[in-house]
Structure formats: C-alpha cells, structure tokens
C-alpha cells in the first residue's frame, strides 16, 4: 500500500481529472496500491461530481491494458449492455449475439452474471449448457471455430479483484457500472452497446471513439432498458468515422410491430432459457421481435446489412434456418470440451 492516490481524491471531488491524472489513479486501484477507504473515496468523489469522458476513457484504457486479451476475427462485434436497468427482461442481448453469429458475423461477447435481471448473460448461457468459466485461449478457439465466444468478465479482468470488495461494500453505482461494455478483452472495434440511462449514450460513444472504435451504436430503450426497445422508441448515439449522430429509433422503422413491455419480462434462469430455446425454434412474439430489432442494429453496425429492414430479414433467416440454434449447440460442445 502507498499514499500515492491520496492527493487525487480531494482533487477529484473539486474538478475533473485530466486523462493522465485519471490513468494514474486507476493504475493505483488496479495494482492494489490503495486502501479500501481510498478506493471508496475516489469512486464516490467521481460519482458525486459526475464522471467525465476523459475519466471514463482513462479507466477503460487502464483496465484494457491489464486484462487477459483475446484474439478475435476481423470484423468481430460485441453486443452487450451495462445492466443495472432494473427491468428484469428476458435475455435479449445474449439471444441477439447468437442470431448475429448465425448470420455470419463474428461475435466476441463480454458479459457477467445478473446485474439488472434474475438472469444475466452468464446465467442464461450456463442454463443452456455452456461452460462460461473458460480462459482466453479457449475463447479464441471458440471464436475461430464457432464464430462466437463468451468472455466472462472475472476470467479476463484479474485486476478487478482489488476493487470488487469495495464496490460491494459501497452498494451503489460507480464508474465501474459502465466499464464492462467499454473493456472488451478482444478489443473489438464495433459494438452494439446498451446503457441503463439515456444520459450515458453520448459519453459512452465519445469514450469508444477515443479508444479506437470504428462503428458503434450506443442505445437506451424508451421502456428504460439497456437495449433497443420493442415497446417504445429508443435513443441512439451512433458512432461512425469519428462522428457521433444522435437520433430516436422506433420499432416500426425496422418493419416490426410494437409489443407491450410486459411480454418481454423474464424470470429465473431456467424460465429465461426455456424462452430462449423457443425463440431459437422459431416461436413468434415480442421476444423474437425484440431480438430481431437488436440483431438488425448489430448487423448494420457490422456492415452486414445496409439498413434495419434488411437486418431484420437476415436475422429472421438466421433463426428460421436453424443457424442461430446451431451456434448455441456448437458453442456448448466447444466450451465443455475446453
């Protein structure tokens, strides 16, 4: 332990930290050079004042540098949300990942266990028979053979062990609640990323731009979810060519009907997995349409589709042809053989 972080705690409470100051601060956190009290003091100083893009980018860049990295195919995309929206929906981004992979786009998905629902990405995948507790080499093998891999956050970010207990004791949101989607161990350059607050989508797009992303959609559903909503219009901050464009997106623009929010509310991991299996078998309804909407957006971000309606067509074929279901079966086999 050292006192190197201490001077920056007071500074962080009164003014934004520069990129260099913030990088130094998070180096201290991730190297275990700060006491729990100092870590908590810094995190709450940042939260109370309000984190800046430079601070987000600094934390993400340090976290990326210290992670166990994964090599992914060119053009790989991450489909992920911050969690923390408190809505308890079915596993939309997880299902979307397999539909997109079934359409031929490599998906390097970063995730964790439940944050905003009874069943997070890792919970759902475990229930579907996948082994999520695998390391970088095994994930790389999955990406190369199946075109999809799941990176369980704790398996790739060992430096978080210093911060985890402090986050648990604080019991409130901190900068780390949005760092997951910004710190993909595969370093993908394309993202469909959901945020629990509409106020985060522009800053997160700016952070991804600063970190080298080529194309990304940062989204927040009008139903309060951290994904494109099927029950309301969604807010989008689209990054492309270093420029960020903000707009609202309605399901009908993709040729999809609006459904009541209640129709995508999830349950236990077992219940969500049952709904996921039905979706893969082609069951129509709100869940499938929500996945089609998000998959269409991901396909646009991946340049696999020129527009959302084409994306919906491609995603529908991925489901009805059995391609998405085959990806689940293949990934289950590969992860359990690891």
From Swiss-Prot:
The keyword Metal-binding applies. Keywords: Amino-acid biosynthesis, Aromatic amino acid biosynthesis, Glycosyltransferase, Magnesium, Metal-binding, Transferase, Tryptophan biosynthesis. InterPro entries: Anthranilate_Pribosyl_Tfrase (IPR005940), Glycosyl_Trfase_fam3 (IPR000312), Glycosyl_Trfase_fam3_N_dom (IPR017459), Glycosyl_Trfase_fam3_N_dom_sf (IPR036320), Nuc_phospho_transferase (IPR035902). GO terms for cellular component: cytosol. 5-phospho-alpha-D-ribose 1-diphosphate binds at residues 81, 84-85, 89, 91-94, 109-117, 121. Mg(2+) 1 binds at residues 93, 227. It catalyses: N-(5-phospho-beta-D-ribosyl)anthranilate + diphosphate = 5-phospho-alpha-D-ribose 1-diphosphate + anthranilate. Anthranilate 2 binds at residue 167. Pathway: Amino-acid biosynthesis; L-tryptophan biosynthesis; L-tryptophan from chorismate: step 2/5. One of its GO terms (molecular function) is magnesium ion binding. Mg(2+) 2 binds at residues 226-227. Binds 2 magnesium ions per monomer. Its EC number is 2.4.2.18. It comes from the Bacteria. The keyword Oxidoreductase does not apply. Its cofactor is Mg(2+). Anthranilate 1 binds at residues 81, 112. GO terms for biological process: L-tryptophan biosynthetic process. It is an enzyme of class 2 (transferase). Homodimer. Belongs to the anthranilate phosphoribosyltransferase family. Catalyzes the transfer of the phosphoribosyl group of 5-phosphorylribose-1-pyrophosphate (PRPP) to anthranilate to yield N-(5'-phosphoribosyl)-anthranilate (PRA). This is Anthranilate phosphoribosyltransferase. The gene is trpD.
């Amino acid at each position: 332990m050292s006192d190197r972080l201490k001077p920056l705690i007071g500074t962080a409470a009164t003014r934004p930290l520069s990129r260099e100051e913030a990088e130094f601060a998070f180096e201290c956190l991730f190297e275990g050079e700060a006491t729990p009290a100092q870590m908590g003091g810094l995190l709450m100083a940042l939260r109370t004042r309000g984190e800046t893009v430079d601070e987000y980018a600094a934390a993400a860049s340090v976290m990326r540098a210290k992670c166990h990295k994964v090599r992914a195919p060119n053009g790989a995309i991450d489909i992920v949300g911050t969690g923390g929206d408190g809505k308890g929906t079915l596993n939309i981004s997880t299902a979307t990942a397999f539909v997109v992979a079934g359409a031929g786009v490599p998906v390097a998905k970063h995730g964790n266990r439940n944050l905003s629902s009874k069943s997070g990405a890792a919970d759902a995948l475990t229930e579907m028979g996948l082994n999520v507790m695998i390391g970088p080499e095994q994930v790389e093998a999955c990406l190369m053979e199946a075109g999809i891999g799941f990176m369980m956050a704790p398996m790739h970010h060992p430096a978080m062990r210093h911060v985890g207990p402090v986050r648990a004791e604080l019991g409130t949101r901190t900068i780390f609640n949005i760092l997951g989607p910004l710190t993909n161990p595969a370093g993908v350059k394309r993202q469909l990323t959901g945020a629990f607050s509409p106020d985060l989508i522009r800053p997160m797009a700016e952070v991804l731009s600063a970190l080298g992303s080529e194309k990304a959609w940062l989204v927040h559903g009008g139903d309060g979810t951290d994904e494109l909503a099927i029950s309301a219009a969604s807010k989008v901050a689209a990054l492309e060519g270093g420029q960020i464009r903000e707009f609202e997106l309605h399901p009908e623009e993709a040729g999809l009907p609006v459904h009541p929010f209640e129709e995508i509310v999830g349950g236990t991991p077992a219940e969500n997995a049952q709904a996921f299996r039905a979706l893969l078998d082609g069951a129509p309804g709100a869940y499938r349409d929500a996945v089609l909407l998000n998959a269409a957006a991901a396909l646009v971000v991946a340049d696999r589709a020129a527009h959302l309606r084409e994306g919906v067509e491609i995603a529908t074929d991925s489901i009805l042809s059995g391609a998405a279901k085959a990806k689940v079966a293949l990934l289950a086999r590969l992860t359990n053989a690891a």
